[in-house]
Amino acid sequence: MSRVISRSTPGGTCIVSKDDFLKSFEEVPKMEISSPSDFKEKLDQTIETLSKGQEDWNKRMNKLKQIRSMVVHGEDVIGREQLLSQLVRLTDCLDLSVKDLRSQILREAAITCGFLFKRFGTDVRQIAERCLPSAFAQVAVSTKVMATCGAVLTLFIVEFIQTKQIFTCIASYSTSKDKNQRRQLCALLEIVLEHWNEKIKRTVLPQIGELIKAAICDADPETRVAGRKAFSKLDALHSTEADKLFASVDSSKQKMLRASDAASSSTSINSERGTAPFRSKLSAGSIGGIRNAPNISSKFLAQRSASAIDTKQVTRMATSVSRTPNIRPMTTRTLSKIDTSPGGSKFARPTVGALGSRTSSNLRARGSVPTSQPGSRNGSPPRRPSATEAFPAEMQRVKSNLGSNSFVSSLSAEEATKLQKAMNTAKESLRQPSRNDDDEFLLPKRPTPQKATPQKSALDTSRVEEVIRACSSTSANEKREGIKMLAGIVSEPNLSNAEIKSLGAVLNRLLGESTNQIVLESISSFVKTHHPRLSDWLKLGLGKLFAKKGAEMTLNSKKQISTTISCILSSFDPTLQLKSTCELVCDPIHLMSPKSRVVLLEYLNELLGKYMERGSSFNTKEMKATILKMFSWMADQRNEQLITPHGEKVLCSLFALNNADFSALFNDFNPDYRDWAYKVLQSHGHDQHVPQQDAVSEEACVRATISTTAAQIEDFVVSRNLDMTPVKSPSTRAISSGFKRVDAEPLRPLSSEMNSQHRDEELSFNESFDRLKLNSTTHLIDDTSEQSKYVASKLAQISGDMGAQQYEGLLSIQTMLCEGSFTLWEQNFAKLLIAVFDVLSKSESDANKKVALRVLTKMCTSQASRLFDSTEMAICKVLDAAVNSQDGTMNVTADDCLKTLATHLPLAKVVNISQLILNEEKAQEPKASLVLKMMTRLFEGLQADELSPVVDDLAPCVIKSYDSPSSAVRKTAVYCLVAMVNKLGMKTMEPHLQNLSSGKLNLVQVYVNRAMSSSSHSHV
């Protein structure tokens, strides 16, 4: 068996081969194993020694040999199953030994691992999966013995451990910076193709094709050679995949692959003089003709180098002799089935006079024959003729032109003269011989698999790859040129799905870097041409556009982005756009800035109002979550004025689109959200300006739409108040709606389909609106005595045992807090806080607890300083209420309350209670998740200078939570770490993140990068 060489060196000094491994497998000292306990004791000693990296290398090397001896002599004693369970314990120490930089340790570790893999196969896959990256790392080492040890170990792993994880690991090295690792990957792909189970191999064949393609296109020539060898193996075992790969590369690579098919142990024909491989190098048409050609000597072909053969002479002569049409091109494998007898035996001996009549008309020989490569027979001195070999002048000229006398010697003087004339004619017609034609003549032709769709040329494919590469370049000039070419590429209709995905990623990246008009125009062209295949891209593309428009300051740039957004609105299916927008709103990774949220709401409003058909259904879980998220945006006091008007417009658009779905959707919400919704609808109906009678009226359809929408709003408002007792307030004022019907008559409520079974008579709009004012407490602001009595009565209700009265009292207090009519804080704050805490602790009603949480939130925003001393208790009460609740929506209310508490109360106290909860030995998973979410909101809501002093206290707790067995806790821990990095920067967080494993750290980095690209407020 040939040795595995990791890099090009003269000779094979200091190189370890697979044979060396096999010889060493059982060359170990004999060891007595008396019992399973004896085996375990010896294994413990071995593990102890191998786990010490600083231990004497000779001891460690002997222990590695001892492992093989224990397996050989102990398997029969303790049994295979028990042996395997013990061997798994070696995983860490074997991996450490494979990583060792001493060649003696590495060699023995590699031999031991190879021995285990060959003997036990996938039963020890855990060891193989751990050691494979370490073995690959050794392949890149400059020391030959270490590099080849690592390379041979990878061969054993891939041959005997046939798992998807192993393939995924080796595939990752296709982009390695080290050429030796990329070259080794090709050797491993050959093993996968040859040895792996068909069932497993079938699932990874497309990936194998991509890896071989990458190797064929590699910058390193030796890697390209290895890639061509892997392609030959793929062609031999899976011709369909090979044909697909062949069709996907450009013409130069196709030619290279055909040359690889045709190549033998030597590149020139004279090294395979007159043997079958030469025929396999010819196209099928050439073989058919040359086989019967009467005037071509086998010695002529055998004695000339490949570059000296005049291919046109041979093919045309063969064509003229056989007079048969060309056969369809066949693959190399098909050609190899043709008779493989020695090459010269199939050519008939030249017949006198047979050539002369055809040569002058059909033969097109070259006037001059290219010189052979250095070292070929053409460069050697010509043999001196004997005295008996006297040639006429014509024969000498033919001899000098053809460079060989074996073919010419069989011709008569007359034939030689005619041949010379034909060659002179060819010299005039073929002034510039093409070496490419020579190459093509010698290369087998592959059939291109037929496809239903037009096949794009390899030139187009390479052009797309070139543009993508240029747009990703760090060179400003190269990127600029790539962006210019991008505009023409994206509108091509025959792009593959992979190219569309790559182009979409490039456009998103360019959009995140700067506002470039060419990029925006390219996105518009991209969307117009390929929108049926861009459903996966839509969400990310919209997120980028919203973030970019929200961050943009110049009016001109905003207009350009708006044009691109309008193109998306008009191109994609509205239902798909609504779904993608809802997913974007609810995605916790896309941390949109307030201005970006405004852009999103504007887009959503336009989508609902102009592009979706009236009556379209939207009662989905995604839409419900979107509305809840929108409410949370509107409730944020810092951005309330910016976002609320746009959120209210979206609510009205939803109602106008399908009022039945709107009502059904809000029936699932808690009463507060329902109240908020109909108040929004009511306020928008009331605030519309009344058109003057003498003003120019709108078109009839527009007026009808306004009238219908107004009537629907009335119906919704009235239906929401049917359960309220119609008690007239003396202070009630008659307020008429601002909406007018087409006939300018006052609005009257239409019969509501939703509640027709509950209504016996129509209620006027004024009466229904009056009912909204019944619970108003604004009149108590100035009347302190009345307010004191009112608050005392409500506190008594809250403290009572009746659930309904408790709920009513909490709602009344909440109304006062919302309207700002609760002014007697000095007298009532402590009483109200105790009452709220009692509800959170003792109430059995989840609805009461949710209202109590909202009251606590309002108390914190209004009188945060009064709550300072009760910070820890407040947070604990909220957490207990959420954890003990069976209501799925309780966590949403608790999240909002905790966010308010964390951002308004003393930071030190919030950090202290968070540490205590997260550091509990058996922390409750729901409670830990809520605390981590609270900390995430904390880092999103406060300034970096406030948070820097506490990061050293909080970060270890979050890192610890990342190791939780609960996936929900791990997920929230990742979001919290991302928020920390975004706010404080990677440099500040790096000391803490070093405690994470590489996989976890990579995951955090991925989310950080996503957050950076989508948020204009990133601090990283």
Curated annotation (Swiss-Prot):
Q: Name one GO cellular component term.
A: nucleus
Q: Where are the HEAT repeats?
A: 954-992
A GO molecular function term, named singly, is: microtubule binding
Tell me which Gene Ontology terms the entry assigns under biological process.
astral microtubule organization; attachment of meiotic spindle microtubules to kinetochore; cytoplasmic streaming; establishment of mitotic spindle localization; meiotic chromosome separation; meiotic spindle midzone assembly; meiotic spindle organization; microtubule polymerization
Which residue ranges does the record annotate as region Disordered? Answer: 259-280, 329-387, 419-461
Keywords linked to the UniProt accession: Cell cycle, Cell division, Centromere, Chromosome, Cytoplasm, Cytoskeleton, Kinetochore, Meiosis, Microtubule, Mitosis
UniProt keyword Cell division, yes or no: yes
Which Pfam families does UniProt cross-reference here? CLASP_N
Name where it mostly resides: cytoplasm
Instruction: Answer whether the UniProt record assigns the keyword Calcium to this protein.
Output: no
Comp. bias intervals (Low complexity): 259-271, 372-381
Indicate where this protein resides in the cell. Answer: Cytoplasm, Cytoskeleton; Cytoplasm, Cytoskeleton, Microtubule organizing center, Centrosome; Chromosome, Centromere, Kinetochore; Cytoplasm, Cytoskeleton, Spindle
Q: Where is the composition biased (Polar residues)?
A: 329-343, 450-460
According to its UniProt entry, what is the function of this protein?
Answer: Probable microtubule plus-end tracking protein that promotes the stabilization of dynamic microtubules. Required for the formation of mitotic and meiotic spindles. Specifically promotes the polymerization of kinetochore-bound microtubules. Also required for cytoplasmic streaming. Essential for embryonic development.
Complex and partners: Interacts with hcp-1 and hcp-2.
**Family per UniProt?**
Belongs to the CLASP family.
Q: Which protein, by its recorded name, is this?
A: Protein CLASP-2
What is the protein's species of origin? Caenorhabditis elegans
